[in-house]
Swiss-Prot record:
It comes from the Eukaryota. It is a multi-pass membrane protein. Residues 31-45, 62-72, 108-117 have a biased composition (Basic residues). Keywords: Cell membrane, Ion channel, Ion transport, Membrane, Transmembrane, Transmembrane helix, Transport. The keyword Ion transport applies. GO terms for biological process: cellular response to mechanical stimulus; detection of mechanical stimulus involved in sensory perception of sound; inner ear receptor cell development; lateral line development; vestibular reflex. This is Transmembrane channel-like protein 2-A. It comes from Danio rerio (Zebrafish). The lineage of its organism: Eukaryota, Metazoa, Chordata, Craniata, Vertebrata. Residues 883-892 have a biased composition (Low complexity). GO terms for cellular component: plasma membrane. It is found in: Cell membrane.
Amino acid sequence: MPKKSDTTRKLEDVGIEIDGDVDSAEEDKKSKGKGGKKAAGGKRGKASEDGEDEDEDDKPPKGRRAANKKKPAPVDEEDSDDDIPQRRSAGNRRRGNVRERGDGDKKKSGKKGRRGGKKNEKGKGKDSDKDSDKDEKKKKNSSGDESDSDEEDESMSEGEMAKLMEEVEEKKKLIANIRNKPWRMRRRLKVLKEAQQFVDKFEGALGKGKGRKLYAYKVMMMKKWIKFKRDFENFRTACIPWERKIKEVESHFGSSVASYFIFLRWMYGMNLVLFSLTFGLVVIPEVLMGLPYGSIPRKTVPREDQDTAMDYSVLTDFNGYCKYSVLFYGYYNNQRTIGFLKFRLPLSYLMVGIGTFGYSLMVVIRTMAKNADVGGGDGEDNEFTFAWKMFTSWDYLIGNAETADNKYASITTSFKESIVDEQENQKDENIHLRRFLRVLANFLITCTLGGSGYLIYFVVKRSQEFQNMDNLSWYEKNELEIIMSLLGLVGPMLFETIAELEEYHPRIALKWQLGRIFALFLGNLYTFLLALFDEVNAKLEEEESIKNASIWFLKEYYANYTANNPNDTGTPPPINPADAIRGPCWETTVGVEFVKLTISDIQVTYLTILIGDFLRAFIVRFLNYCWCWDLEAGWPSYGEFDISGNVLGLVFNQGMIWMGAFYAPGLVGINVLRLLSSMYYQCWAVMACNVPHERVFKASKSNNFYMGLLLLILFLSLLPVVYTIMSLPPSFDCGPFSGKERMFDVVMETIDLDLPAFMGTLFGYVANPGLVISAVLLMVLAIYYLNSVSEAYKNSNNELKKKMQMARDEEKNRRNNKDSTNQVMKDLEDLLPNRPPTPPSPRENIAEKNQGQGGKSAKVKPGTAGGVHLQKDVSLASANPNARGPVTRAPGPRGPGPLPGQPGAGRGQGPPPRRQ
């Protein structure tokens, strides 16, 4: 065997085929004699001696490359050749078909120069000429590399294209769900970066030919659209008002306190829309296009009141200039159209009044429907509560220290809430004593409600007597507002004291407390309305006499003017608006009462927070060191946030706004300012002055209980306004409906004058009582049917939940009891005559083989009866005989022997099992 050179041996060891230029003449002849032994696999022709054949051999066949390729090359023509992945089969790699470019050629030429006596007959000059020819031909062929790569990409089969598409989709899913992976952050970032690089590199390769650029453009636009939606969602979340404040409160005081501020924010949004409707369609048109102040009597302060119209005491009572302003009903003119736009102000006033209730009703019902499904389908929350909170509560993407502190406080509070729920579920009680105490508590609360209603009715009657008296004190002027505010302040505290007898769960106790305070506020409000309507009826009687007197006064004025100026044939000058006789304008009187009630409620609420919370916390904080007892642990201690009182205060105040907005359009703006200031003021108070409740509890996942109270008071607030519109006659000298029999007549006037005749006929048919009653009955039947269907669906869902829970429990028991440790169950299993066979485990197979060879007896499992084979030993609790049994041994190092399921793979220090 001829001896090979060192260079040849090294090149063959690494799998590089030796070309004719490298070998010497003798080796070239010997290689020819061996019949092309160095040709890999015989599939490729012998390498030629010139550079052109060598370059062609460097490129693999296109067909084989397309068949063996798993990942396509980049599709862009601008990509370099280094980016094209080299795909070769395993057989070609074993045969040494991998060739080097560029640097390999330089190494070959360098090694040729160092060979000395084994040079070729052509010499150095010929070798250098050949190398230069190779470089020139490579440059000529470099222009065709890009077209060759494109042809190779286009030669991908449909299966490879589908496989690549699946891989790209999998990477996209991984990118979308990377947060849900239980990995460390370093691994998440690494996997995310790799997936993004893979998608960016191969997503454009899914197009073909001319459609590739269009596909790449679509992919780019899709990415930009997804990024835009994500940024817009972040922007919309950032635009939610007071989100950070509410989250901070929730983290320290629990979800129950945060639910109040969420409800307050929702109320602010709804009132902002009502404010836009009222000011945009009523107040601003009257200010811009209506008659100015002082032009007519309803817009002018009477002459006898002008001297005191700007006094502070008068303005705080909303008299003087406040009474004759756009804040109240009486300021608006009854002209059918105003301004150059011919704006129909009376119709707009009525439609806005009705639309306020319509929009509020729609928003409340929609919110309740949206929250109805919140909290459904969360069966896992009822099991392993503390395990879920322990292992899934923390957010590992938090990077802010303040956010981490809030999250820590929130998790701590949620654990306290769950502990309270667990304690309430396990509490034992004396049922008879509990029933007696609850009946007693309800009796005391009923007496309190009745007494507060009688007190308000008595005060309203007394205030009517004060109106005819002069030189009243401040208390006598504001007695009604003071009594109602004090009842709203003292009543909830009294109810909370009585509720201690009942010992309800905190969440249930909160609902009872809310219901009782709601009954107190609603009773007070309706008592106030009944007493107020008695005053309205008295003013209507007074208005008739004043109307007759004003007509007589006008006739007397014209007669006196004609008598005093007999030569004047012109029209007499109009009466000065300040000197005209005024009616009582009962709508403005009602509006003033509602505004005063709202302002007094705001004052009492803010003073209560300032004195009852801030001053109390100040005393406890700074006087505790020099006091006789511990002020923090004993009396007075820090205050707790009164959820029920504050929620019912909001609901009660909103009911007054709905009722009074028709008589005082400016009341909606006052309420918006109140809610805006309450958010900042109460957030500061609760964070600075209050402490969390001793019994922290979770709020309901939806605020539907609050919404239910709001819906009820909305309906009850609608009744007085509808009664006013349809039944009571408007004042004759103030307001947009003056001069009409009923306020609703403005709609009939618009239909008769502005719409075609058939519209009036159609509206008359629609307003027919028979049709209205039929429609109402149909709606009631539809509601009953839908409610029945909803109850049926709810029962079906509950049954399905029970079945799913039973199936989950059964599967859990079956999995846990596969290898029963109960001796009685084992004895019962041994006595069963017929059992389904199970395939033997690998250990049993090895034991049987050893028994067949060595003649040893088969091992008998402890506890099994005689004559029962080990293969037939099946647990009663196992439904699947092929299921793997649980691990019943203690964890520890595995001994010598094969792994389970791998008889030939030894593990440990012992030898592997003997092979047959």
